[in-house]
């Protein structure tokens, strides 16, 4: 037992439950169809050594695909990519939900080896506590929860690390709990505000009217009798370096900042805007970087995930406070974060995903939501999950939680992406989205590097022109306009002009991409 481990465990009865990861392996092969819950969100705060030990056992004993070693795996969002990828490669994941990242798990899903379902993240953790996902179990519970912590309180409760996610709900639903105490990571104590699940009809309103407001506990409460093992982990989270913002992302950010300036001038937003939500990726980083350099002051953030760019945002003096459920930082970002702990910790709070993504709070605060889709169609239906309607990427995540309930709902995307044979082979503005996650009723603004389509109050026919003229790539504008004109001509005959489509051509750009490597058509 290391001195750091002993120091971090302030509940002394747990000292008798210290085990190695290898000593926990037998719990996982006890019976088929086990339900397993992990901590973690967007690749940080997930368990590492126990899942790795289970993988090693499966590999050494040629147990890949054995029914006792295939699991229903639930994580608040994506877990550590390396760990989950190893499970996927060993055919250990029978069912997965609600969000994942990594080529092996995506391959398992799209090849039919793993059943996957996604869900709005605020609803997923809630539905877990309703027993919706364990209906075939007599106990209606999770068999094992493996939760990363950075400290344990005097009463045996958990201090999470850089992610809260669905850990409170997973702990609540678990029969057995394994705590991975990460001594490589400094303690995050004081950075959390945790609310445990309360089921209807006893649920009360979330008394949050400001991003910095607390209403929970600084730890995850649990029943110490459920804890079967404490395992030391000495491995830091691994997050890849962020790609620098390209010119397209910077142009999108500039278009958004111009919109905010216009909304302030028109009196529809206050001078310090309203709480901001931003996803992850190059465009999201460019937006945050642009806001850090812009003239807006005293900004607040209510979001899911904070990336390295938010550290610059804090240091610019323009950001007052941020709430999230995960801090997804690179190695350099975490070092910078802990080197400036006294400053950053005063301006940051980590909550569960049920709270960070809660529609009640998002609507009350008037959040400005910004997310990136796979594609958006001319009537502003957005696809966030399934390429060509069939191939799952990662899952819905929290985009729907925010976009349905925000005061200002924004989707930003490049106007076009390269295919294998054409540098502009994929238009992100299409006649009809091949899968719809966000409907036309959810979006206010669509932004590309070409411009910004303000869709508020527009009819579908008006939206189609706005989308094509403002957001589509020039290589596709005439083609898309020709589709709209053809659709309006045909639908006029049948008196169905509200949202005109030519069904035989609605997906022709997608089929042409599959057959010819580009969405650019010779003719409709």
UniProtKB/Swiss-Prot annotation:
Gene Ontology MF terms in the entry: acetate CoA-transferase activity; acetyl-CoA hydrolase activity
A GO biological-process term: acetate metabolic process
Gene3D superfamilies reported for this sequence: 4-hydroxybutyrate coenzyme like domains (3.30.750.70), Acetyl-CoA hydrolase/transferase C-terminal domain (3.40.1080.20), Glutaconate Coenzyme A-transferase (3.40.1080.10)
Enzyme Commission number(s): 3.1.2.1
SUPFAM superfamilies documented for this protein: NagB/RpiA/CoA transferase-like
Sequence intervals crossing the membrane: none
Enzyme class: hydrolase
InterPro entries (alphabetical): AcetylCoA_hyd_C (IPR026888), AcetylCoA_hyd_C_sf (IPR038460), ActCoA_hydro (IPR046433), ActCoA_hydro_N (IPR003702), NagB/RpiA_transferase-like (IPR037171)
Superkingdom of source: Eukaryota
Keywords: Cytoplasm, Hydrolase
Catalytic-site annotation from UniProt: 304
UniProt family annotation: Belongs to the acetyl-CoA hydrolase/transferase family.
Protein purpose: Presumably involved in regulating the intracellular acetyl-CoA pool for fatty acid and cholesterol synthesis and fatty acid oxidation.
Descriptive protein name: Acetyl-CoA hydrolase
């Amino acid at each position: 037992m290391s001195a750091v481990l002993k120091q971090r465990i302030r509940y002394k009865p747990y000292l008798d439950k210290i085990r190695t990861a290898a000593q926990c392996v037998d719990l996982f092969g006890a019976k088929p169809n086990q339900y397993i819950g992990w901590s973690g969100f967007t690749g940080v705060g997930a368990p590492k050594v126990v899942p790795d030990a289970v993988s090693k056992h499966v590999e050494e004993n040629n147990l890949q695909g054995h029914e006792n070693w295939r699991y229903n795996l639930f994580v608040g969002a994506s877990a550590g990519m390396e760990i989950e990828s190893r499970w996927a490669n060993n055919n250990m994941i029978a069912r997965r939900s609600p969000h994942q990242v990594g080529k092996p798990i995506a391959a398992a899903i799209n090849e039919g080896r793993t059943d996957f379902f996604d869900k709005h993240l605020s609803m997923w953790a809630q539905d877990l506590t309703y027993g919706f996902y364990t209906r075939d179990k007599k106990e209606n519970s999770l068999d094992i929860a493996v939760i990363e912590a950075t400290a344990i309180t005097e009463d045996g409760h958990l201090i999470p690390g850089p992610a809260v996610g669905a850990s409170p709900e997973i702990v609540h639903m678990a029969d057995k709990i394994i705590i991975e105490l990460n001594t490589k990571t400094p303690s995050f104590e004081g950075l959390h505000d945790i609310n445990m699940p309360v089921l209807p009809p006893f649920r009360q309103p979330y008394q949050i009217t400001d991003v910095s407001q607390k209403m929970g506990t600084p730890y995850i409460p649990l029943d110490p009798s459920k804890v079967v093992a404490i395992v030391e982990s000495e491995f830091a989270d691994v997050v890849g370096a962020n790609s620098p913002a390209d010119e397209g992302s910077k142009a999108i950010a500039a278009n958004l900042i111009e919109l905010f300036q216009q909304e302030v001038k028109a009196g529809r937003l206050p001078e310090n805007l309203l709480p901001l939500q931003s996803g992850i990726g190059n465009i999201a980083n460019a937006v945050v970087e642009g806001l850090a350099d812009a003239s807006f002051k005293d900004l607040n953030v209510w979001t899911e995930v904070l990336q390295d760019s938010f550290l610059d945002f804090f240091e610019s003096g323009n950001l007052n406070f941020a709430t999230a459920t995960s801090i997804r930082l690179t190695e350099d970002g975490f070092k910078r974060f802990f080197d400036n702990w006294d400053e950053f910790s005063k301006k940051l709070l980590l909550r569960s995903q049920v709270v960070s993504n809660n529609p009640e709070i998002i609507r009350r605060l008037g959040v400005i939501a910004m997310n990136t889709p796979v594609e958006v169609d001319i009537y502003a239906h957005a696809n966030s999950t399934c390429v060509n309607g069939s191939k799952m990427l990662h899952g819905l995540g929290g985009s729907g939680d925010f976009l349905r309930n925000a005061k200002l709902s924004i989707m930003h995307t490049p106007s076009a992406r390269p295919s294998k044979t054409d540098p502009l082979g994929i238009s992100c503005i299409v006649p009809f989205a091949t899968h719809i996650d966000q409907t036309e009723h959810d979006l206010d603004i669509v932004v590309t590097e070409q411009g910004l389509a303000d869709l508020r109050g527009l009819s579908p026919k008006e939206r189609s022109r706005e989308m094509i003229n403002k957001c589509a790539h020039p290589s596709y504008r005439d083609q898309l306009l020709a589709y709209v004109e053809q659709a309006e001509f045909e639908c006029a005959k049948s008196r169905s002009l509200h949202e005109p489509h030519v069904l035989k051509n609605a997906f022709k750009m997608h089929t042409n991409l599959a057959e010819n490597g580009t969405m650019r058509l010779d003719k409709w």
